[in-house]
UniProtKB/Swiss-Prot annotation:
Homodimer. GO terms for molecular function: DNA-binding transcription repressor activity; serine-type endopeptidase activity; transcription cis-regulatory region binding. This is LexA repressor. The gene is lexA. InterPro entries: LexA, LexA-like, LexA/Signal_pep-like_sf, LexA_DNA-bd_dom, LexA_repressor, Peptidase_S24_LexA, Peptidase_S24_S26A/B/C, WH-like_DNA-bd_sf. Residues 28-48 bind DNA. It comes from Myxococcus xanthus (strain DK1622). Keywords: Autocatalytic cleavage, DNA damage, DNA repair, DNA replication, DNA-binding, Hydrolase, Repressor, SOS response, Transcription, Transcription regulation.
């Protein structure tokens, strides 16, 4: 089996750590920033090497589809991941990640997932919503993705939240600014949503996004 370079090992360790901490893997851009690699092509070269050597699986043209293999975890001294059990998460409708789409607080269905994907968050505190639109694509959140959301009425600046604005649910980054709140899309072609402090209510924030799930096209699995 081919040995990893020190750089490749550091990248692999970062991917595993971010996945376990945040509930989803880092993007190529985030890996580049962490490793001080300016070129996305440079990051891709390392990822291709990790995939070729059997330490990483990745989906085509998906920014958050990096999955470390069992071999990778053994190499990093983590051991094979134990099955932490399946949890059933209520599916509450769709999130408008573009033009807001009304999402009723009614459980449409439920999804069973490995609790590992929640990054340590108690499954009882989580609900799922399906994304509709393109406003968060630069954060690796795409139309049709399922978001795992931790129920909480508050958030830290810059966190990705699901917010209820004028009875419509939307997913944006949360930024309090002086006398207003800015809900920022991650798409340069779209404008933020502003809500004044006077109109802002704690119930506007439904929760914080802790994970993303995407079905890969063509039947490929990570």
């Amino acid at each position: 089996m081919e040995e990893l370079t020190e750089r490749q090992r550091e990248i692999l360790s970062f991917i595993v750590k971010e996945t376990e901490t945040r509930g989803f893997p880092p993007t190529i851009r985030e890996i580049g920033e962490h490793m001080d690699i300016r070129s996305t092509n440079g990051v891709n070269d390392h990822l291709k090497a990790l995939e070729r050597k059997g330490y990483l699986n990745r989906g085509e043209q998906q920014s958050r589809s990096l999955v470390a293999t069992k071999r990778a975890r053994l190499l990093l001294g983590l051991g094979a991941r134990k099955d932490s059990g399946m949890v059933e998460i209520p599916l509450l409708g769709k999130v408008a990640a573009g033009a807001p789409l009304l999402a009723q607080e009614n459980m449409e269905d439920s999804v069973k997932i490995d609790s590992f994907l929640l990054g340590g968050v108690n499954g009882r505190e989580v609900f799922a919503l399906r994304v509709k639109g393109q406003s968060m694509i630069d954060d690796g959140i795409h139309d049709g993705d399922y978001l795992f959301v931790k129920k909480t009425p508050s958030a830290q600046p810059g966190e990705i939240v699901v917010a209820l604005i004028e009875d419509e649910a939307t997913v944006k980054r949360y930024y309090p600014e002086g006398d207003r709140i800015r809900f920022q899309p991650a798409n340069a072609t779209m404008q933020p949503i502003y809500v004044s402090r006077a109109e802002f209510r704690s119930t506007m924030i439904l929760g914080q996004v802790v994970g993303v799930y995407r079905k890969l096209q063509g039947g490929r699995t990570p």
